[in-house]
Design a protein with these regions (language model features):
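...with weaker cross-activation on analogous glycine-rich loops/strands in unrelated enzymes
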Residues: 102-179
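Active-site signature of cysteine proteases
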Residues: 166-201
Length: 201
């Protein structure tokens, strides 16, 4: 006689809002999710499915899920630091790692903004700060803070992830902005924007 064993698996559909509940999104994060899933962003989600160099919403979604974190411990400790450091680059690297982009060489693991810029420039994946970016690009800033980080010197001081571009403004998600994960908005071409790393998603 022949004996057969059958394994039955039930696969159930989970919506984005199901997952938002599972991961404990707060009200602000849910509002960002609503905006990401609005009809006006359909073309952006198509690019995630079919691929567009430099544009990606997976890393944007991961970054948005972290909005509200204070102190950056998950990011700088993941990087390997035993105590707090300036953690904006650790945050970008952590988000990239969550998407598998460090392992695949799409985005570097970097704790120094200067090193992040150089990685993209070495590969010809760099846009000047006057350019109009796409979601998922990596933004770098050269702050003009006399008496603090000093005047602009052409070297990156801060980094984040481009969320969207709308009505002449670039919206970003950044870590270590006043020691928090938060969103920011600046005019395209604003003089403190050094440029953009363009990952080959």
């Amino acid at each position: 006689t022949e004996r057969r064993t059958y394994l039955y698996i039930t696969v159930s559909h989970k919506t984005a809002y199901d997952m938002a509940s599972k991961y404990g999104f707060n009200q602000e994060q849910r509002e960002y999710l609503d905006e990401l899933l609005s009809d006006e962003n359909n073309s952006l989600w198509s690019s995630v499915l079919y691929g567009t160099s430099g544009e990606d919403n997976q890393i944007v979604a991961v970054a948005l899920s972290q909005v509200g974190n204070v102190g950056g411990r998950p990011y700088w400790s993941w990087y390997g630091f035993n105590s707090r450091v300036e953690w904006c680059a650790c945050f970008v690297s952590w988000c990239a790692n969550e998407c598998g982009y460090i392992e695949t060489g799409i985005i570097p693991k970097y704790a120094s903004c200067v090193n992040g810029v150089q990685w993209f420039k070495d590969r010809g994946q760099w846009l000047d700060g006057s350019a109009e970016p796409l979601p998922g690009m990596i933004i770098f800033y050269d702050w003009d803070k006399q008496g603090q980080s000093g005047q602009q010197d052409g070297r990156a001081d801060h980094t984040g992830i481009v969320w969207k571009v709308e009505n002449g403004y670039v919206y970003t998600i950044e870590g270590n902005l006043s020691d928090k994960c938060t969103t920011s908005r600046r005019q395209i071409g604003e003089y403190q924007i050094l440029g953009y790393g363009v990952p080959e998603y």
